[in-house]
Amino acid sequence: ERHRQEELRLIRELRLQSARKLLSPHLLFNAINAVAPKDSTVSEHLVNIARFSVQMLDKNMVSLGDELQLSREYVSLHRAMHDDDPEVEWDLDPSAQSAASVPTLCIQTHVENALKYAGASHITVAVKRASAAIEISVKDDGAGYLNTVSAPGQGMGKGIQTMSRTIAVLNDGRMNKMKYDILSVAGKPGTEVRIIIPDEDKGNNNR
């Protein structure tokens, strides 16, 4: 139990590092410069992202609604700052969103990867209920995960490693294990991330 708590503490620190990157001075400088010429709502998106980050990053599991809202804010900010932003489609099953809990940043991480590294023209975020579980998919038509990861622990690979570690540690406290898969074929375009989150068993506490 002591080892597991230490793992959870380290994962929280990794999430905080991700938040620092998300709200880095470089991003803030670019965002501020984007406000005047485009008359955009960049500042509003930045404030919302900061607010969600403060509320969420100290938690291991958050509501699906909050995770989706953070991801939408990130997409909106990215779109306001880039002219060549890919289309992002949200395919959300309303029955999957009531009272569901998901690992923190489990959608935002992969949306960010698709926007920043994949070079995709289309991204689909899908959430549905299947039996006694929530199924999440983030799919893009970009270069492909196996073709874009240049070195372990950097860029897209670092975010995926952190999420994989997070889910592995959280699974130690669950009777019904979460599943996390990256579907990518070397030399072929496109990546799909699939996360299956069974309904929580009684007595489980990963927060």
Protein language model annotation of sequence segments:
Residues 179-190:
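A short beta-strand-to-loop micro-motif at the C-terminal edge of the catalytic HATPase_c
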Residues 198-203:
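Two-component histidine kinase transmitter core
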